[in-house]
Amino acid sequence: MIKAFAHIETELGKVFAQHFTAINSDVESEKVNNLWQDIAIRYNEAQRAYHSLQHIEQLFAQFKQIKHVLNEPHLIALALFYHDVIYAPTRADNELKSAEYAVEALRPYFSAAQCQYIYALIMMTANHKLAECSSAQKNFDSAYLLDMDLSILGASWSEYEQ
């Protein structure tokens, strides 16, 4: 089982690096890897049942199928990685804390507009409602992100129970 988790972590780390460097290829790979390691550590915290790396892996299985229709696939991917990075089961502000955390982590590498969009995407996962975005293209991408996040509710019972 631990070997399977290590494989998930390694593969997702590669995916994270691909999307990150597609936006900013000037960042040293060590810095990108450090960002990923921090994400992986957080998704492996003991209090997580559903909001784990397995959830992120499931999201990216779907993402692969639809990324070609997205206007900003790399920003959507980063929002997926960060959307549950902060998780305390008894708190109601996990999405806010995750959005703030993402912006803090990404601000040195991305534009203010890119960080704000990732923040807005993560905040939409709090109530799974589309917020007013500055363009129809961003609303389109946002809808896909929310659909992916809620897709477990339409999965088979055996998949849902995992």
Task: Explain the meaning of each model-derived region.
Residues 59, 73-89, 98, 118-126:
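His-Asp-centered metal-binding catalytic motifs of divalent-metal-dependent phosphohydrolases/nucleases
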Residues 47-50, 85-93:
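Short coil/turn segments at secondary-structure boundaries
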Residues 1-56:
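Conserved N-terminal diphosphate/IPP-binding helix and adjacent helical/loop segment
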Residues 93-102:
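Post-HEXXH active-site segment of zinc metalloproteases
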Residues 45-75, 101-109:
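Alpha-helical phosphate/pyrophosphate-handling elements in metalloenzyme active cores
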Residues 30, 68-73, 135-141:
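Structural motif
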Residues 111-162:
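Histidine/acidic-rich helix-loop-helix segments that form or flank divalent-metal centers
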Residues 32-40, 53, 77, 115-126:
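Short, well-structured alpha-helical segments
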